[in-house]
Design a protein with these regions (language model features):
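Membrane-embedded alpha-helical bundles that constitute the cytochrome b-like, heme-associated redox core
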Residues: 1-175
Length: 175
């Protein structure tokens, strides 16, 4: 196998685009703090809806990857590269599965529901929590975003290493 299955490639790039949007809307919400409450609520809803969408896509991606497999790294790839690639992929999957759930819990803990793109309410059992609990979830979500950003930077650095330094065809696995 020289490339990932077409469904995996599609989900990979769709997820990448959605993550960029998550950081865009998340940054806008946090750093520009819109004064218009309706606009602010819409930004939060878009960010949260995209987060839930990413979570579903990652679940689908895991199922498809288990069913279709993945191309192997070249046999001459150093052992350290193999270990780092595996750890980075596992960590990315873990964060992409946990981060949206923490975000949803964060939203709910402050007493807000999530209406997925205004189409239906996403159920969540925790409901409004004391402010200190809600703030802990907010902090966890922020640290999760920072962790995701660092993992994505490492993932991109790995892709650049394979594409520009080793020139070993690994980048074509996802192209």
């Amino acid at each position: 196998m020289t490339r990932y299955a077409p469904a995996l490639r599609l989900i990979h790039w769709l997820t990448a685009a959605l993550i960029l949007l998550l950081f865009f809307f998340g940054g806008w919400m946090v750093y520009f703090e819109p004064k218009d409450e309706a606009f602010k609520d819409e930004l939060y809803n878009i960010h949260q809806s995209i987060g839930v969408t990413v979570w579903v896509l990652v679940l689908i991606r895991i199922v498809v990857r288990l069913a279709t497999g993945a191309p192997r790294l070249p046999p001459d790839a150093p052992a350290a590269v193999r270990v780092l690639a595996t750890l980075n992929h596992l960590a990315l999957y873990a964060v992409l599965l946990v981060q949206p759930l923490v975000g949803l819990a964060d939203t709910n803990a402050w007493g807000f529901p999530l209406d997925w793109f205004g189409l239906f309410r996403v159920p969540w059992p925790i409901g409004k929590q004391p402010d200190d609990v809600a703030q802990r979830l907010t902090d966890m979500h922020w640290w999760g975003a920072l962790t995701l950003l660092l993992l994505l930077a490492a993932h991109l650095a790995g892709a650049l290493y394979h594409g520009l330094v080793r020139r070993d065809g690994v980048v074509r696995h996802m192209a």
